[in-house]
């Protein structure tokens, strides 16, 4: 009886162990299956979204390339924001408006009258000015007006450097002639009257000397005659 009871207890113990081990096995299988389903369901929408994004980007690039190939390139220059005047639509429009305004004024006068001839000369001068702006490569802005480039670029020296040097030369010539005239009349009895009433004969002799004012100024600077002492200046 004791042996029979022991065998029954042993068989009961062995029979209970599989019952306890089955549920964890089933739980693990079910978890792995659900995880796989979630991954598949998540991967499918992301893949379709990537395909749609790539297709949209490809279509957009095709449209941009086709438009760039068919449309002519815009007129551009070496300075940002500026366009060569001969290629600027705003510049051509401004020229057309200027000539049109002068032509409307020309119609008010007889063909051979003095005002008509003066207006016609102005029209010719206006056309020539706009033509020169385009011929010499000036750059225009969005307003259609030429812009001077003062950055020191050698390609645009003719727009600013050359006129600037010419202006300084003319201004120096005028100043040197005036200085020479004041020095010439300073030794007279009433120099102030010579400043008010200009001696034309004396001024006519001094004016031609002013054309070499850079050389004359350098010579006086070397000799010490260009600047006077403070003691010789009257207050």
Swiss-Prot record:
Would the keyword Plastid be found if you checked this record's keyword annotation?
A: yes
Q: What is its main location?
A: plastid
**GO BP term (any one):** photosynthesis
SUPFAM superfamilies assigned: Subunit III of photosystem I reaction centre, PsaF
What's a Pfam family in this record?
PSI_PsaF
Q: Where does it live in the cell? A: Plastid, Chloroplast thylakoid lumen
Q: List all membrane-crossing ranges.
A: none
Cellular component, GO annotation: chloroplast thylakoid lumen; chloroplast thylakoid membrane; photosystem I reaction center
Where does the transit peptide start and end? 1-77
Keywords from the named record: Chloroplast, Photosynthesis, Photosystem I, Plastid, Thylakoid, Transit peptide
Q: What does this protein do?
A: Probably participates in efficiency of electron transfer from plastocyanin to P700 (or cytochrome c553 in algae and cyanobacteria). This plastocyanin-docking protein contributes to the specific association of plastocyanin to PSI.
So what family is this one in?
A: Belongs to the PsaF family.
The protein depicted here goes by the name Photosystem I reaction center subunit III, chloroplastic
Q: Which organism is it from?
A: Hordeum vulgare (Barley)
């Amino acid at each position: 009886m004791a042996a029979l009871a022991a065998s029954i207890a042993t068989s009961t113990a062995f029979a209970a162990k599989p019952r306890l081990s089955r549920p964890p096995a089933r739980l693990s299988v079910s978890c792995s299956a659900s995880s796989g389903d979630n991954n598949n369901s998540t991967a499918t929408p992301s893949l379709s979204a990537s395909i749609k994004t790539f297709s949209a980007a490809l279509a957009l690039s095709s449209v941009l390339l086709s438009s760039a190939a068919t449309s002519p390139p815009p007129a551009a220059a070496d300075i940002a924001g500026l366009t060569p005047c001969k290629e600027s639509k705003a510049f051509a429009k401004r020229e057309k408006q200027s000539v049109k305004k002068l032509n409307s004024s020309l119609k008010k006068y007889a063909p051979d009258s003095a005002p008509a001839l003066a207006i016609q000369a102005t029209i010719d001068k206006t056309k020539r000015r706009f033509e020169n702006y385009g011929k010499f490569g000036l750059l225009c802005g969005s307003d259609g007006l030429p812009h001077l480039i003062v950055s020191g670029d050698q390609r645009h020296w003719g727009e600013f450097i050359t006129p600037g040097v010419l202006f300084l030369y003319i201004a120096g010539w005028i100043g040197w002639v005036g200085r020479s005239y004041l020095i010439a009349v300073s030794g007279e009895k009433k120099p102030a009257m010579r400043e008010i009433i200009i001696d034309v004969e004396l001024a006519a002799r001094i004016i031609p000397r002013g054309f070499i004012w850079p050389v004359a100024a350098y010579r006086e600077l070397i000799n010490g005659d260009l600047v006077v002492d403070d003691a010789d200046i009257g207050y």
